Regions:
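A structural signal for short hydrophobic beta-strand segments in well-ordered beta-sheet cores
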Residues: 49-51, 101, 199
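Short strand-connecting beta-turns/loops that link adjacent beta-strands
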Residues: 55, 105-106, 202-204
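Amphipathic alpha-helical effector-binding/dimerization core
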Residues: 60-154
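Juxtamembrane membrane-water interface segments immediately C-terminal to a transmembrane helix
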Residues: 29, 75, 225-229
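Short, highly charged C-terminal tails/helix-capping segments
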Residues: 244-257
């Protein structure tokens, strides 16, 4: 291991399922001498990316909490959209989970969410969790506005069951564009139905979506136009606020220079 890769590989070992590691365990997992791992872990502890846990174990450190706060206060999409998620939930006709998600490379990540107090199930779309690109309304709404070679490049590493599955995907994407929103049921989580609309800002390089997720058992056809109207209204508000944030950033840099 060399350069940043060595730090990245160690940090990526930590997960919800495995939150603490010893130097020896990391050494075995990465097939790297324990002396090398010890030196890197010591550097990560000094930088507060890791901290000592019980015994000889280490866990993720306070640096991540600090950076999470900075992102929450500075990220344009989070700043513009998070305040509206609870309002959207309150205006939806049934209990819902409401999600802001964004494209990072070729994966989708939830950056903010709000769950109605009486919503019974959990969704896979949770803050900080990477999600598949081609399944679920939340993800599909993001890529429905990407066209041509950009879309081809984005989907290069995606695996479809067969050519028919791929054709169906593009046909659905075309229909989504005509309707202005995506709707899927059970693609990511069984028993849940999702609706999503795109949010874009080319100046800030933001390709994102706003979505509402419901229990399928609660959903009635007459809810659909209300859900679509709510999502559309709030997505326009969020895009307007993102534009204001862009103007603020631009003005700040002009004054600084």
């Amino acid at each position: 291991m060399s350069g940043f890769t060595r730090y990245n590989k160690i940090l990526n070992l930590f997960s919800e399922q495995r939150s603490s590691w010893t130097v020896l365990e990391i050494s075995d997992e990465l097939k790297t001498p324990s002396s090398t791992i010890y030196r890197i872990v010591r550097e990560l502890v000094l930088a507060e990316f890791l901290e000592s846990a019980a015994g000889a174990y280490f866990r993720l450190g306070p640096a991540f909490i600090k950076f999470n706060r900075i992102i929450n206060l500075s990220d344009p999409l989070v700043r513009a959209g998070q305040p509206f998620l609870k309002k959207l939930a309150n205006e939806n006709p049934i209990e819902s989970v409401n999600v802001l998600a964004r494209l990072y490379g070729n994966k989708v990540m939830c950056v903010a969410d709000y769950k109605s107090p009486f919503f019974k199930n959990n969704t896979s779309y949770q803050k900080g969790k990477l999600m598949p690109l081609i399944y679920g309304a939340t993800s599909r709404a993001i890529i429905m506005k990407i066209v041509g070679k950009s879309l081809e490049d984005l989907l290069k590493q995606e695996t479809f069951y067969d050519d028919n599955d791929k054709d169906t995907f593009f046909k659905n994407l075309k229909n989504d564009n005509k309707k202005g929103y995506c709707k899927t049921e059970g693609q990511v989580d069984k028993g849940l139905i999702g609706f999503a609309v795109p949010i874009n800002n080319k100046k800030l390089g933001i390709e994102a979506s706003l979505s509402s997720i419901f229990n399928s058992i609660d959903f009635l056809p007459e809810h659909e136009p209300i859900i679509y109207a709510n999502l559309t209204s709030y997505s326009l508000l969020i895009e307007r606020y993102i534009n204001q944030i862009f103007d603020d950033i631009q003005n700040y840099h002009q004054i600084s220079s």
